[in-house]
Amino acid sequence: MSLRHHCIALAIATVLAAPWPIRAAPASIDWIRYSVPETGAAVDVPSSIFTEAAEKPEGGYGGRFLTADRRADLTVQSVANDAGLSPADFLARKNPPPGIVYKRVTPRFFVVSSFRNGRIWYNRCNFAGRFAHCVLINYPAAEKRQWDGVVTRISNTLASR
């Protein structure tokens, strides 16, 4: 076997042996549009990944979802912002932990992300009317690359009416 064929075979074997979701082509992930009826927030949720419903989030409206193995979770939540705080002020009042790896704050939303206990946590909140509409995702840090596309789609589809 030539070196080129050996490298191709090794690459294929690596992909086939990798844990989800590398083996799952994006077309094989089933998505649903989850809505928070009380507030109008909506987001795309990968229903073939987050297969279990969990307890409702505290302090707002929405839902929580878990993977079957419970190694990852997703919270979709609308939280009252009756004081009309800006995303920057709202985030500051939540006292985010030190060591945030990624932070972006605009007049309409914020995103923060970091590592904790071998997991990545990602939080995006969009501001509309008297609510902050948020997604919070926790997943194994060792699977970051596999989750990147899923997290991006969830984040980019968060909307409110």
Give names to the regions the model predicted.
Residues I29-R33, W121, T152:
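Acidic/histidine-enriched, beta-strand-rich ligand/metal-binding domains
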Residues M1-L10:
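Bacterial N-terminal signal peptides that target proteins for export
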Residues A9-A18:
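Bacterial N-terminal signal peptides
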Residues W147-S160:
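Short, low-complexity, Pro/Ser/Thr/Gly-rich segments in the mature regions of secreted, periplasmic
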Residues A18-W20, V45:
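Hydrophobic alpha-helix-in-membranes signature
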